[in-house]
């Protein structure tokens, strides 16, 4: 047996008989009586008690000729404004609306809503507009007109008021109109615009891989970013990252020196010394400082400098090197085959950005700043290029107001294609 003090809005349901205690007397209800009482209470909570200011149907409703709703007349479709003249309670104790034409409908909040504006209050908030947003003259209720607004998608806006309607929460942009919260983002959403452009212009071009990551939001846009290509000199980012890590750990010093012997060009994974760079192609047995070697790799893409660092600093790309770089790149960084993806290169460039060491400075002033990604960009760019055979790549940190990673791998495409992609991305994220 359970006891319950009679109250207007509280009912406890039990499978056993329920005892109500009005004053000092006990009243026992059967389970069926409890169920009926519960149903009546639930129905009461979903029924109107007065005529709403701006009634609108949200489902198809039936109309009747009498208050008891037994003589069917017709139906009214959803999203129809109602003209209600009065509210009555019929013989069953159910509230019903009388329409202006004399018909009756159930006064249920399950099928009719008060389509009015309420809870309007001042706010001071910033949002980003979503693609295809709609601006209204007032918070939306049925019949509200759209505003003549020139607000663009993927732009920051300030709002000054918030209001509720049955359609949701709306925010006021002064001088423009009201926007539903579903058309707004609390975080910078421009990466969605980047993805849209990539899809429209480059997605069907299998010889292009692009990875973009906004560093303030950690949001990514990409096409073919998991496609593996010969990375050429982009793979040198692994050497730069590892050297910076050991510098930060005080295990190395920029003044450390290493001798250029014939051995440095002969270990597995070594670059062809006849390739890019200014250091002698033939071993000269001279000592080179770590600082100068890092600058040569970052700024001149020097193959010999990479080999010297690979031989001494990474111990010929040993397990410690591999473990560290694989973790930073979130994938296996293959210095032998040098097969990598735009995503892996972009991820490692982000790791170098997070290190915030000397490597960033070196990568910001290279022999290749007048081409590819940085060609038309008017903010600082730290980047690493890669060229071999038909492969042309560039991986960059672009220091816009909201910095981002841009990694572009291409096969059988020119530098201008990389520049075009970079211009498209920067045009949105600058």
Question: What residue ranges belong to the model's regions?
Answer:
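SH3-family beta-barrel domains
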Residues: 2-5, 10-63, 75-76, 92-95, ...
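Active-site-proximal beta-strand/loop segments in catalytic clefts of secreted hydrolases
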Residues: 174, 213-216, 261-263, 297-301, ...
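Beta-lactamase-like hydrolase cores
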Residues: 183-228, 298
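Active-site-adjacent helix/loop patches that line small-molecule binding or acyl-intermediate pockets
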Residues: 189-193, 262, 268-355
